[in-house]
Amino acid sequence: ITEVTLKVLPKQKSCTTVVVYTEKKKLVNELFEKISSSSSDVSGAVFIPEEPKDEEYQYNKERVFKFNDLVSNKSFLAFRVEGDKVSINEKIKKLNQELELDKLSTTILDVHQSIPFWKKINSLELFNQTNNNLLRIVVPPSSSIKLIQNIENKFKYYIDWCGSLFWVEIPSTKNDKIKEIKKITQEIGGYLTIIKKSEEFDFEETIFTVN
């Protein structure tokens, strides 16, 4: 009698990122809401707009997010789906219906592009070399559209946590704008933290929170 031992290996985990190209902030907000309420377990969702036309910022978005299947000179929303290949395909198929992706301009980042893409997001590589102020703002997802409307095209920023976390860069010559953003953040029930200060920063407050 010959004994045969069979080993059942777990399915290999992978990840895929779906990129949606849009400049419409209302659509971005709607997509974030649908992604948050989806049962497809999206593990990350960000919106990265075009950089403002202002010489006080470093234009590095295209370099930082240079991937074969990503059009980095456009505004885009990206979300990540994880699991084995079969479950990823099933989740994306369901999300395609929920988000009506067929009506939008999209591309797909495979696992070899997804992993470095999200590393760049998590390490804030877009702001790595800045000498400006860097703000971390957390707001209720339902109120994020109000903050978007107030900062769009004025500052370099991107949105993480499916709409509730904003990273905003404020030029050192516009320190007074921090107070304006603080006021807006308070009004919508959020809080603001200054992660990095410019050399010209002259406010006494460094951390703003709402009780």
Question: What name fits each language-model region?
Answer:
Residues 102-211:
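Conserved glycine-rich FAD pyrophosphate-binding loop
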Residues 1-127:
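C-terminal substrate-binding/cap subdomain adjacent to the FAD-binding core in PCMH-type
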